[in-house]
Structures are given as structure tokens and as C-alpha cells.
């Protein structure tokens, strides 16, 4: 007599197999998620202290009373670079308009490029300021940027601090280039990390001075301080600085905190 095939038994076996496979996939997925979370949380994150928040709140409240287009404050410890930063809807107004609202040619105000984000989150942020030159007794605006064309000066003054209403950003000088004002390296937008790294690499090739301890990486953010040269107003000194990322911030501050203090010079 032929055996009757037990379809119900086969169906039960199939259901059990499916349940086991689904369970295994779920467990593996949970395991991967935990691994990712653990790896991410192992990176130190930077938290803005209450002391810093209070300081910045007071600082920018006072600056904004004088000029409501204030977006930042920039200083380079050990130099006389010590200026508020503004941004408006063009790159001409602050060439001669002072922070207080007057008009003084070859003084003006340090300003951010009109197309940059105010929060310094762009891959490349541009700040522009006049170089007062040797004929003027002060060091206002970006006069001291030109001094970075000497390697010894760069080595002694590596850091620049940007204060914003929300937090401070710290930068390390990477290299200084001397280029025509029409340089093709003046860009703000990049397709991806590779495109940005290519730009940085090409710019650095002909740099006048370099900080070789700064490794170029396409996922970093950079700041450029741009000013004219005294010998030729159509030539620019562009100081490229790497922003210290948050996952390096705690170690950076522990090592360099005393070198970063603000000392008023203006």
C-alpha cells in the first residue's frame, strides 16, 4: 500500500525553518548595531562648557550692539591678529566700511565670503581683510597674515581661534600660498572628499611655507585668511588652516590650552 504524503507535517517543518532563519538574522543585526554603537561612543566628543557659553553670550551681545552683521571673532595667539568678523550679501561693502560703521579705505572690516555658511561648517571658509603694510603703524586687519611667509614665524604661531555665538573653533596653520587675485583655487563648492583633497594637494604644491605635521584629508574642514601683498595689490597671501575636529578636541585642548588664550591687542 502506498504511503500517503503528510503535507501538514511538511508545512510545519517549513514554518519552523523560516522562523529559525529569521531569528538568526535578527540576532546578527542586533549584534552589528551594538558594535557600531560601541565604536561610535568610544570616540571622545567635545562639549561646550557653560563657562564658554556664558563668555560667548556676553561677547557677542556687545559686538552685535555695535554691528548686527557680526558672525565671529578671529585671533591668532602670539600675534596682533585680533578682529571681529562680519558677513553681508556682497564682498565689497566691508572693503572700506569699518566695524563701527565709518568708511576708511584700506581698513574696512574682516569679512566672511558672502556665500559661506556662518557656522564654519563648509569644507572651505574664506575670510578677507586688508594688510595695512609697513607704512602704517598698526597691525590691524590681516596685516600679520603676511608674516606667515617666513617658516620660523609659522612654526611659532601655528594656531588661530574662531569664536562664534555658539562655540569656539580651533585651527592649525597648514600652509601659506602667494597667488594672483584671479587664482582658480578660489572655490567654495566641492563634489566630494576626493575633489576637496585634490584641491588642497594642488594648492599646497607651490606653498611658500608649510606645516608638514598637518596631514591633508578630504573630510577635514579648512579656513583661509586672505589678504593682499604690500609689494603688489594684485597678489594675495592665503593662509590655509585645518579645523580641529570634535573627536580630536579634548586631546588638542589638553595639550595646547595655555597657548590659545585670548590677549587683546586692538
Predicted regions and their residues:
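N-terminal secretory signal peptides that target proteins for export/translocation
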Residues: 1-7
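Short, conserved catalytic or interaction motifs in soluble domains
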Residues: 32
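Solvent-exposed, non-transmembrane regions of membrane-associated and secreted proteins
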Residues: 35-266
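Sec-dependent N-terminal signal peptides
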Residues: 8-20
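C-terminal motif of bacterial Sec signal peptides marking the signal peptidase cleavage site
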Residues: 26-29
